[in-house]
């Protein structure tokens, strides 16, 4: 370890504070070298028992990105129609109000998607899918440790990164292995990062 090249604590904290989920993305592609550095940073994250059962898949083909967005919207649209059916809503909402937190938003997402907007990927030009074997009991924890490494590396490279919670939720709600086939992965997706060149850089910190 070359300790002389390690950043000062103040520099590390500066990077952490500067990292924000900038959803204003441009269509410019991310250089391959930057993408590889992001993946490399993710690979160096620790894993439980040093099992290293974490895999990383980059998706950069526009058609495949669109299929992932279509899949996500389709899962949510189907769910929204079921939840918002008058009979179902009357019976279920008093018992499970938590299910209705995003029901209206799901329908809105479908309308935005059909209008040609991109409410899911935000016009990201790449997705980093972090996945683990289904048998890995701590796969989620391992994957999200790797995600944070990748996120900070992306920030240092001037690449915006957005946690794809909607895509991850749809992958879990959809038919078994449907997302895995579309995304070209094995195992279970545990964390998904959208990546893109930002239209601008934030000049102020956000208070936490």
Regions found by a protein language model. Give the residues of each.
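Acidic, surface-exposed loops and disordered segments
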Residues: 1-208
């Amino acid at each position: 370890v070359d300790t002389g090249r390690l950043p000062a604590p103040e520099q590390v904290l500066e990077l952490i504070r500067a990292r924000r989920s900038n959803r204003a993305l441009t269509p410019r592609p991310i250089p391959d070298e930057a993408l590889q550095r992001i993946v490399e940073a993710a690979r160096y994250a620790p894993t439980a028992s040093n099992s290293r059962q974490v895999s990383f898949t980059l998706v950069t083909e526009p058609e495949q990105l669109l299929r992932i967005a279509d899949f996500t919207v389709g899962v949510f649209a189907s769910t929204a129609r079921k939840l918002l059916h008058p009979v179902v809503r009357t019976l279920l909402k008093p018992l499970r109000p938590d299910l209705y937190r995003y029901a209206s938003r799901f329908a809105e997402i479908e309308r935005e998607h059909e209008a040609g907007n991109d409410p899911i990927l935000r016009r990201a030009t790449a997705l980093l899918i972090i996945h683990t074997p289904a048998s890995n009991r701590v796969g989620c924890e391992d994957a999200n440790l790797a995600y944070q490494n990748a996120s900070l590396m992306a920030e240092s490279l001037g690449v915006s990164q957005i946690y794809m919670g909607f895509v991850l939720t749809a992958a879990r709600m959809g038919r078994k292995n449907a997302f895995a086939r579309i995304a070209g992965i094995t195992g279970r997706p545990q964390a998904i990062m959208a990546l893109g060149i930002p239209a601008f850089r934030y000049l102020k910190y956000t208070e936490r």
